UniProtKB/Swiss-Prot annotation:
The organism's taxonomic lineage, starting at the top: Eukaryota, Metazoa, Chordata, Craniata, Vertebrata
Keywords, comma-separated and alphabetical: Leucine-rich repeat, Repeat
LRR repeats: 16-36, 42-63, 66-87, 89-111, 112-133, 135-156, 158-179, 181-202, 204-226
Protein name as it appears in the record: Leucine-rich repeat-containing protein 28
Species of the source: Xenopus tropicalis (Western clawed frog)
InterPro entries referenced in this protein's UniProt entry, alphabetically: Leu-rich_rpt, Leu-rich_rpt_typical-subtyp, LRR-SigEffector_domain, LRR_dom_sf, LRR_R13L4/SHOC2-like
Protein encoded by which gene: lrrc28
Pfam families: LRR_14, LRR_8
Matching PROSITE patterns: LRR
């Protein structure tokens, strides 16, 4: 086996191969033949599926500087060294079916990375540096132990496909609604009890899957007429305690995101002073940003600045920005034309989040 491996690598070096297949070789360490002398300067794609690797060499980028694809599916890799960030041409990295518990911040240095697959590992969190992957199009994080997603993920403005099925997520950051290129979002099999108010507002987002989030009972009305998967949602009894606000309509009780401070009703004709102040400040803030001649830096508390940059949501009737209070209106899925598509497999409702009693009274999902 060792002779055959050395021969394969030697031929690849001599003939300047661009692709090298070392799958199913029972390797428990990275082959030294790949790293000796100048390495394989011409190699672009390296496939090492179903081996027993536990880590990667520190000088990988130095010896294989032109790698565009690194396929390490089904190994025993526990950590990835910081040197991974030096693979400046890498476009595709697959570390699925390994034993990763931590993803090093240097992953954010892979400026050319388009596809990152980390399915079936032991990740509990992601470094915020992942937001630096400006070219990233596909991110698959299925079957990990993630309890949250970094807000900075919204900076991956090329991201088209995000999959976080079978994790431990109780919520997702509202900032993800700013992913302008996102076409498909899959969050099945988590612990979601609510979704961001603006989810589905982007026209680019066409496919959303939230199946088997048993406590999830409300879908933002922006998702109506999208392709949605919501089987197994809407448990009739709460399975775990949570501190989310909820509102009741008939026999239905729907949780709202944790950022919502209060819930208005059809009889609340006067907006809270804090909400009015934030809406006025937001208008000034937007005008300030549009004034190209203004060079004065904005000096505001971090939490306030983040809220102005990414409001709680936008009214589903008139698009007014909302910051503390929402006026919700329920449309049970079973009472819409979409009921036939789901055939009783879900008990969710569409929720229109409005900015005032006027919008609440005039919003109609089916018109």
């Amino acid at each position: 086996m060792a002779f055959e491996l050395c021969h394969t690598i030697s031929v690849a070096r001599l003939e300047k191969h661009k692709n090298l297949f070392l799958n199913y070789r029972n390797l428990n360490h990275f082959p030294l033949e790949l790293l000796k002398d100048e390495g394989l300067q011409y190699l672009e794609r390296l496939y090492m599926k179903r081996n027993s690797l536990t880590t990667l060499p520190e000088n990988l980028a130095q010896k294989l500087p032109n790698l565009v694809e690194l396929y390490l599916h089904s190994n025993n890799i526990v950590f990835v060294p910081e040197a991974i960030g030096s693979l400046v041409k890498l476009q595709s990295l697959d570390l699925s079916n390994n034993a990763l518990e931590i993803l090093c911040p240097d992953i954010g240095r892979l400026k050319s990375l388009r596809h990152l697959r980390l399915t079936n590992n032991r990740l509990k969190f992601l470094p915020p540096e992942i937001g630096k992957l400006k070219e990233l199009q596909t991110l698959d994080l299925s079957t990990n132990h993630l309890v949250s997603l970094p807000e900075k993920l919204y900076q991956c403005q090329s991201l088209q496909y995000l999959t976080v099925d079978r994790n431990l997520l109780c919520s997702i950051p509202r900032q993800l609604c700013q992913l302008a290129s996102l076409n498909e979002l899959s969050m099945a099999g988590n612990r979601l009890a609510s979704l961001p108010l603006d989810l589905g507002r982007s026209r680019e987002l066409q496919y959303v899957y939230v199946d088997n989030n048993v406590q999830l009972k409300g879908l933002p009305s922006y998702l109506y007429n999208k392709v949605i998967g919501c089987s197994g949602c809407g448990s009739p009894v709460p399975l775990t305690e949570n501190k989310l606000l909820s509102f009741t309509s008939g026999q239905l009780s729907i949780h709202v995101p944790a950022e919502v401070k209060s819930i208005g009703s059809a009889t609340d004709f006067v907006l809270p002073l804090q909400e009015l102040a934030l809406r006025s400040l937001h208008a000034i803030f937007c005008s300030f940003l549009q004034d190209l001649s203004c060079t004065t830096p904005i000096s505001l508390p971090k939490s306030l600045l983040e809220l102005l940059q990414c409001p709680l949501g936008h009214c589903h009737r008139c698009s007014q920005s909302m910051f503390t209070i929402v006026y919700p209106k329920l449309f049970p899925l079973r009472e819409t034309p979409m009921a036939g598509l789901h055939q009783g497999r879900t008990a969710v409702s569409f929720v229109a989040y409005c900015c005032s009693t006027q919008c609440l009274q005039t919003f109609d999902l089916l018109s």
